[in-house]
Each structure stands twice: as C-alpha cells, then as structure tokens.
C-alpha cells in the first residue's frame, strides 16, 4: 500500500486528498482572516510580488489550488484597471473554497472573464497547450503526488508557457529560523483554535510546511517534470519562495 505524508502522519496515498479537503472545508469561512493573522499581513505583499511575475495580462491564465481566489482576483482587478483582455480559470479540488472565491468575485464585481473548475492538480480537465501561465500559491505542498501535478502543469501550458509557484520554504538565517519555527509550532495552531476553532487544521499546516522540500530540492523536481529555465526568488528570508520555469 502506497503511503504519503499528511503533516507528520503517514497515511494511505488514496486517503490524503480527502483529509486535506476536510481541513480546508472546515476553515473555509475563516481562511482569509487566518492568513492575515498568521502572516501578520505579509501574505499580501508576497502575493503582490507573485503577480508581478506575470507581465502580460492579455493571456490565458490557470490558477490552480485557487482557494479563496486571492491570486486570480488580484490579477482580474489589475487586468480590469489596465483594460486588458484576460482569461482566468480558477481551479481547486475543494468546492467550499471555490465558493468563497466566487462570492469574493461577485462582491468585487470581478466575475467577468472568470471560469471556475473543481479539479485535482494531478488530473486537470484541460487539453494540452491550453494556457500561457500556470499559477499556484500555497497549494502545491497539499497535493498528494507533487511530481504528477508538476507534469500536469507542464502539459497544459503552451510552448514557452510560464509556471509560477509561491510556496513556504526553508528559512536561511539562524535567528529568523529559530523564531519562525517557534512561532509556527506554538503560536499558529493556537491562533487557529481561537479564530477558526480548529487547532488540528493548523497543526497540519505547519507540519506540511516543515516537510516541504527546500528551494533547491523543489527546483530539481520542477526541472525533472520537463521545465526549463527553472529558478526561484526568496522572500522574507526564505519564509516563502517564488519558483518559476518555462515549458519548451
């Protein structure tokens, strides 16, 4: 029986996605608030830097593990302000999270040119060579088979399409590393209990971050999936990193 990690626990590979779905379904309505509290608002700056990696908004963009839609809606607003003809597809395996994204899109009057698809990052329901950009923010570490998801990203991108991934990473500096580890394992789950009423969900979160490959290890995984010009940029001392690559 194939096993994989669900946080620090070993679980049957076929059960991981259901467990992850339960985590996000249970915290969907507090997801955005928790992001602000856990990151002290830094996630907004990280995401702003992330979308700057997309210079051409007259494009077909796929946002995978879209969650509550932060990345896609930032792009949609930027495109609207610049009168660009953007086509955005928001994909997430968790329907409850996509419902949050749809609600936000309606509230912000950004629903035009958006498509919503419930789908696994491992099996995307799109033809080969469909998109100019593939974005995924804080989602790839939750996928049961990351290598399979990376190959799917390569498949659905057009030639010279760009893959961009924002993910928690490995902190380099010692004093920041020590504080970050203490904050992650002691403070974040407590905030999760107080705000979302779910300590276990945020214990999973910090455990999944701790187990995620280093910047260089993930760079090799992206390259092995078939991408070229693979690189990364650390933000906030390596708390997160933006990974980018191109298809052939």
Swiss-Prot record:
EC class: transferase
Keyword set includes rRNA processing: no
Assigned EC number: 2.1.1.163, 2.1.1.201
InterPro entries with a match to the protein in the record: SAM-dependent_MTases_sf (IPR029063), UbiE/COQ5_MeTrFase (IPR004033), UbiE/COQ5_MeTrFase_CS (IPR023576)
Superkingdom of the source species: Bacteria
Transmembrane segments: none
Alphabetical UniProt keywords: Menaquinone biosynthesis, Methyltransferase, S-adenosyl-L-methionine, Transferase, Ubiquinone biosynthesis
Residues bound to S-adenosyl-L-methionine: 68, 92
Known catalytic reactions: a 2-demethylmenaquinol + S-adenosyl-L-methionine = a menaquinol + S-adenosyl-L-homocysteine + H(+); a 2-methoxy-6-(all-trans-polyprenyl)benzene-1,4-diol + S-adenosyl-L-methionine = a 5-methoxy-2-methyl-3-(all-trans-polyprenyl)benzene-1,4-diol + S-adenosyl-L-homocysteine + H(+)
Pathway(s) of this molecule: Quinol/quinone metabolism; menaquinone biosynthesis; menaquinol from 1,4-dihydroxy-2-naphthoate: step 2/2; Cofactor biosynthesis; ubiquinone biosynthesis
Gene Ontology biological-process entries: aerobic respiration; menaquinone biosynthetic process; methylation
UniProt GO MF annotations: 2-methoxy-6-polyprenyl-1,4-benzoquinol methyltransferase activity; demethylmenaquinone methyltransferase activity
Biological function: Methyltransferase required for the conversion of demethylmenaquinol (DMKH2) to menaquinol (MKH2) and the conversion of 2-polyprenyl-6-methoxy-1,4-benzoquinol (DDMQH2) to 2-polyprenyl-3-methyl-6-methoxy-1,4-benzoquinol (DMQH2).
Family assignment from sequence similarity: Belongs to the class I-like SAM-binding methyltransferase superfamily. MenG/UbiE family.
Protein name as annotated: Ubiquinone/menaquinone biosynthesis C-methyltransferase UbiE
Organism: Rickettsia rickettsii (strain Sheila Smith)
Lineage summary: Bacteria, Pseudomonadati, Pseudomonadota, Alphaproteobacteria, Rickettsiales
